[in-house]
Amino acid sequence: MDTSSKENAHLFHKNSAQPAGGPSFKAGYPSTEEARPCCGKLKVFLGALSFVYFAKALTEGYLKSTITQIERRFDIPSSLVGIIDGSFEIGNLLVITFVSYFGAKLHRPKIIGAGCLVMGFGTMLIAVPQFFMEKYSYEKYERYSPSSNLTPNISPCYLESSSPSPRSIVGKSQNKINDECEVDTSSSMWVYVFLGNLLRGLGETPIQPLGIAYLDDFASEDNAAFYIGCVQTVAIIGPIFGFLLGSLCAKLYVDIGFVNLDHITITPKDPQWVGAWWLGYLIAGFLSLLAAVPFWCLPKTLPRSQSREDSGSSSEKSKFITDDPVNYQMAPREESMKIMEMARDFLPSLKSLFRNPVYILYLCASTVQFNSLFGMVTYKPKYIEQQYGQSSSKANFVIGLINIPAVALGIFSGGIVMKKFRLGICEATKLYLGSSVFGYLLFLSLFALGCENSSVAGLTVSYQGTKPVSYHERALFSDCNSRCKCSDSKWEPMCGDNGITYASACLAGCQSSSRSGKNIIFSNCTCVGFAAPKSGNWSGMMGRCQKDNGCSQMFLYFLVISVITSYTLSLGGIPGYILLLRCIQPQLKSFALGIYTLAVRVLAGIPAPVYFGVLIDTSCLKWGFKKCGSRGSCRLYDSHAFRHIYLGLTTLLGTVSVFLSTAVLLVLKKKYVSKRSSFITAREKIVMSSSVKKETCAARDHGLQPKYWPGKETRL
């Protein structure tokens, strides 16, 4: 070929790959030759989507790790904390349907980038109350503070002979309450946390439906499951860092940098300790803002893989976007016509989804299972703290370092299994169902791995320390502290030398106190001697008694079973997601994912933390009270009731989801069997028709003379 012909060929190739005016001779997406330089953009999108998944998952994990910190800082019950946690789902609910449906027809990467900006600002808004609230004030005797120049022999017990009359005490207390109520302006600052989490939910909305559908559209069928598995795995790595960040911040005092830490008398092991919960939200918000940058540089569409083009599977965008890529820049009139066309097709598309029995059953199964998982994950740190006596920092640390990696490994393993064995939709459903069955069977064993209640005088054991106390026998007053003028609303736990915790040193009947560093020692405690009369040491120390060594052993067993259960349940994550993508029409993919996300948010994400929190609150033994006398957060839980509510509700919901998943498999098998039988019947008819035609043609050709068909004697 000469030079001029080469130039003409090059010019023809250039013009055909990048048409200037007329329609391309290749319909649909850019040609393969043009696609090769741009194929790396799919990997860029994969990396950007993975990072934003990491950022949003880190924030979500950090939020779960600060549940107890927020509860104590704002002095609110678990049910209200559940509402704050569910505000994220409420934000999703407001826009998920429109974003998933209309967003699929617009510039998906830029919509995701805008969502990241909103999510980042919302995350930072959560931390704002810390800078406007008063300094954290935990329940304590002011004269026991190191800054109050404590002198020895001050009696926590106001003896009846030397104390003012009960009427004067009540009057002074009421006046103090009224004064504090006037200056307590931070009682409702939790609303900003609610609004920030709501805004975070709004920004997160387009990431999952648009991002996953974008990947599935432009990746090959073999790589789609693997790419989604990579994204989901990175999303699970996010909570690891979220919980570890929560563990680090929980060790720092809430007002660090604003107060003298030498004056703080409590430690991270104290039930009243509040860590620097606000610090992690500033870090997570910055990461979300940073994650928005790459999406503004990515194109609206990418070249499709050759396998997808050969298979003829239609993109979700092919229904409303023209085949010529040059025509993506539409005039305003054409753009408005497109939007009207999409709006008219909304209800038919919705009806098509709800007429799909596999989609509806899987939607119900996933919703019930996510109720189980949302409730379990939200209150898992609190469960570890209350059941096994661990600090908030340690609870977050073990979840982030042990549990979350098991979930990540399970999700990644599910993607590898799907890719390695090329599982079909029925096999994927079986793997999804099997992982759920074995996971919840393992979860049942956690019922046997509980600890006994802490020995708290008047609440879990009698003041004699010899027998448990029933619900009707609970009373913080006894003969041993009858001469003291104590408040039963205070929670200033003191650990006696007899191993029993008392609600306060006053209720323990202590008549003197002294300080050793930050520790406060109480002496001559009549109730301590009442439970151990033979012991000559009737003293105690500020703080709650630690649980016995047997509970530490149970905690190790709990971690082992919890890790195995987490891996088993997460193994079915990717197969279940592939089932969701393959049981619907390709052009409805983003819309179906949006409806799926909407249902999970509305029916699981919002209510699950709330009703889990309400039921957990019923196991509270000792409530705290705010300055104005209203009920605050729970100070002490009944370990047995907490365990049965937390584990029982999770198992019940998981069992229901297993039955619904079984129905999905049965309907799917029936649907495929009927389709296969109809396909075989149609194929047999075609084969029989072809054989008849061949015989007829052979008979006709046999009667023709060869001269009319020169060279065709052997035809047919």
Curated annotation (Swiss-Prot):
Coiled-coil spans in chain: none
Keyword Transmembrane helix among UniProt keywords: yes
InterPro entries: Kazal_dom (IPR002350), Kazal_dom_sf (IPR036058), MFS_dom (IPR020846), MFS_trans_sf (IPR036259), OATP (IPR004156)
The reaction(s) this protein catalyses: 3,3',5'-triiodo-L-thyronine(out) = 3,3',5'-triiodo-L-thyronine(in); L-thyroxine(out) = L-thyroxine(in); L-thyroxine sulfate(out) = L-thyroxine sulfate(in); 17beta-estradiol 17-O-(beta-D-glucuronate)(out) = 17beta-estradiol 17-O-(beta-D-glucuronate)(in)
Free-text function comment from the UniProt entry: Mediates the Na(+)-independent high affinity transport of thyroid hormones at the plasma membrane of brain capillary endothelial cells. The transport activity of substrates L-thyroxine (T4) and 3,3',5'-triiodo-L-thyronine (reverse T3, rT3) is much greater than that of 3,3',5-triiodo-L-thyronine (T3). The prehormone, T4, is the major form in the circulating blood and is converted to the active form, T3, by the iodothyronine-deiodinase in peripheral organs. T3 plays an essential role in brain development via binding to specific nuclear receptors (thyroid hormone receptor).
Tissues expressing the protein: Highly expressed in cerebral microvessels and choroid plexus (at protein level). Brain-specific. Not detected in glial cells, kidney, heart, lung, skeletal muscle, spleen, liver, nor testis.
Compartment annotation: Cell membrane
Recorded family membership: Belongs to the organo anion transporter (TC 2.A.60) family.
Cross-referenced Pfam families: Kazal_2 (PF07648), OATP (PF03137)
Keyword Ligase: no
GO biological process, one term: thyroid hormone transport
Source organism (scientific name): Rattus norvegicus (Rat)
Domain Kazal-like, first and last residues per copy: 474-529
Keyword vocabulary terms for this entry: Cell membrane, Disulfide bond, Glycoprotein, Ion transport, Lipid transport, Membrane, Transmembrane, Transmembrane helix, Transport
Extracellular-side segments: 64-82, 135-187, 257-274, 375-394, 447-558, 617-650
Sugar-bearing residue positions: N453, N524, N537
Residue numbers on the Cytoplasmic membrane side: 1-43, 104-109, 217-235, 300-352, 419-422, 582-590, 669-716
Protein name: Solute carrier organic anion transporter family member 1C1
Gene Ontology, cellular component aspect: basolateral plasma membrane; plasma membrane
An example Gene Ontology molecular-function term: organic anion transmembrane transporter activity
Membrane-topology descriptor: Multi-pass membrane protein
TM annotation in the entry: 44-63, 83-103, 110-134, 188-216, 236-256, 275-299, 353-374, 395-418, 423-446, 559-581, 591-616, 651-668
Cysteines engaged in disulfide bonds, as pairs: C480-C510, C486-C506, C495-C527
